[in-house]
Amino acid sequence: MSQYKTSYDIKYSNELDEFLQNEVLPGLDISVDEFWKLTSEIITEFSDRNKSLLEKRKDIQKSIDDWHLNNDFDVDNLSAYKEFLRSIDYLIDEGNDFEITTSNVDKEIAITAGPQLVVPVMNARFALNAANARWGSLYDALYGTDMIDESDDAEKTGAYNPIRGDKVIAFAKQFLDQYFQLQDGSFTDVVSFSIENKALNLHLDNATITMLDDESKFVGFTGSANSPQSVLLTNNNLHVEILIDKSHSVGATDKAGIKDILLESAITTIMDCEDSVAAVDSADKLEVYRNWLGLMKGDLEEQFMKGGRKVNRKLNPDREYVSPDLSEFKLSGRSLMLVRNVGLLMTNSAVLDKHDNEIPEGILDALFTICIAKHDLKNTNAFNNSKSGSIYIVKPKLHGPDEVKFVCDLFNAIENGLNIKKNTVKIGIMDEERRTTVNLKECIRVAKDRVIFINTGFLDRTGDEIHTSMEAGPVVPKSEMKMQKWINAYEDWNVDVGLECGFKGKAQIGKGMWPMPDEMLKMYQAKIEHPSSGANCAWVPSPTAATLHAMHYHEMLVSNQQEILLSRDKINLDDILCIPLAQDIQTLDQNTIELELDNNCQGILGYVVRWVNQGIGCSKVPDINNIGLMEDRATCRISSQHVANWLHHDVISKEEVIASMKKMAEIVDQQNAGDPNYLPMSPSFNGHAFNAALKLAIEGKDQPSGYTEPILHQERLKFKAK
């Protein structure tokens, strides 16, 4: 239980106050007294607005429930449905065309298309790994994954396998040949490099010299011009660095002495305070904010044991090169960092208002993450994040333009209070709620001078799709959801609206996560669809995945693809409004229904047991088939809402849900048997984690927007209090 201090009619935890005084505010132009005064003013101005917006969500949901109880949804005639949605301010008429006017946006967001990581900022090691994933080893990414098959004695063995290594090198040099074509020969023929007259010379094994077919793709080197240690190339605004060292174990086996090829990989990273973390009280929030502070000041470090030795991880410095004209320049050694705040729903006990009520957690996040980011605006350390002087905040789970405007007003008030130039704080809008999707243009309009990002999120968006239309009928099995008309329309609509509003060359249009971190070959084969769709960033589950996905952006210049897509017909809103109802639910056999239920329950339990008992908000959780999937609250939301929907419409019974939960709890216990910190759910089935999972399924219909946070927070707090 936190101890509090009081000033300006609010209470704040001692630990948060000490953190401010001793760590956050030194070096900034604001005192601790001024900060808490501002906090009190912000709470007075915005807490009631926050509450009113949540009440509006409830009112709209009740109206939709009542409409479905009294009307049949006709997918072939949506006029009555749309008229109803307009009558309750769910669907808003679009205004005139406009383009966003956001200024001072870093090129990593405005220009450079590439992979994006999302990582729990609560975990310092993960956060540092992600920040340092701007550059990744192509050799390592290929060697350590299923990108290279293990046939013909090319297995991943304990020691280096030269047969596998040869396959890796062949793949990598084919990549170079494809995107950095030589005037003559192949990179497999190169024996050495040199720089002469501002040009890259490649010496071949037939004693001839060739050059790049497009000489402008050579942009720098390290070492001497006669014998460079590395060669820097560029394609589609992305850099590739060839590392040369004939004394290296790998370089010694390569005729050109190439020891590795580095790809510019995770161009941007979202440091997450939301779905991938489990932060329920003041102590947890302090951990979140302290790591964000370390990233913004550039001094975050983490020590851990790896392979029997102590590793000290910290932020990578910028990379130094010599240009072809022999001038010196630097490239960032780190991914450009954004920070995702929480949404509007939850409160936190770290700060209490004058009535001793917990304040909205989203307000707390905005105050602290923006104040902390002032350290980066000073640009006084070698690890500066934004070269353009901006602070990038991703805001999730907003329902419509009024909520986007609320957040923009909040940012404006905090800028004023912290002496930050107007519109320094940018907003990334997660398009993951149905009311935001159908009003996306108007959501962007109210943020047109701040917006730098829109992103689709299939999982949360499906959770809201199910919850919004809960009374319409049973939905299709989860495995069929991606084949429904609404989902493809939603993905294309996001791109269409973004381009219509002038995002090209100014802001990111993003796509969602690849959920299987061990299935890299499948990712490589499938994820080209994201740049092809016009998205200039897409989420990946690891730095390795970022390096592999980066190759897709060499294959396609997204800005060219966006130019093509600008001329296509915009998606019909009616397609987005097609509710994914199961037309043949009565024909599903009992085995199919049971398998669907078991799959959902296993996924819920596998995630919730770590969340509640260990405070782990994001992890690789084995599914019912023992395939590791990246799970966060979004995956939990869709699974729990799917069970709740089928339960509500009598496709399954409460007794069947309980039986499945108990059966799957035993499987999850077995899957986690190797974890010494794991607390089994069976055979008692009455612990906080099991209770949370069961509540999420059985009470899912009554959860606000189908969110998992209220139940998860409640049970985690109970667990921590023991």
Give the ranges of each region predicted by the language model:
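Intrinsically disordered or highly flexible coil/loop and linker segments, enriched in small
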Residues: L25-I30, E45-S52, D66-D74, Y90-E94, ...
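Acidic, glycine-enriched catalytic cores built around paired aspartates
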Residues: K82-R86, Y90-D140, D149-T157, N161, ...
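Catalytic or ion-translocation cores adjacent to nucleophile or general acid/base/metal-coordination motifs
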Residues: S2-Y12, I359-F368, N385, Y392, ...
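Catalytic alpha/beta active-site cores
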Residues: S2, A80-E83, S87-F406, A413-I420, ...
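Generic recognition of stable, solvent-exposed alpha-helical segments in well-folded globular domains
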Residues: K11, E15, F19, I30, ...
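Generic, well-ordered alpha-helical scaffold segments in large soluble proteins
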Residues: E15, F19, E23, L38, ...
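N-terminal-proximal low-complexity accessory segments that begin disordered
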Residues: S2-I92, I100
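Hydrophobic alpha-helical scaffolding
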Residues: T6, I10, L25, N50, ...
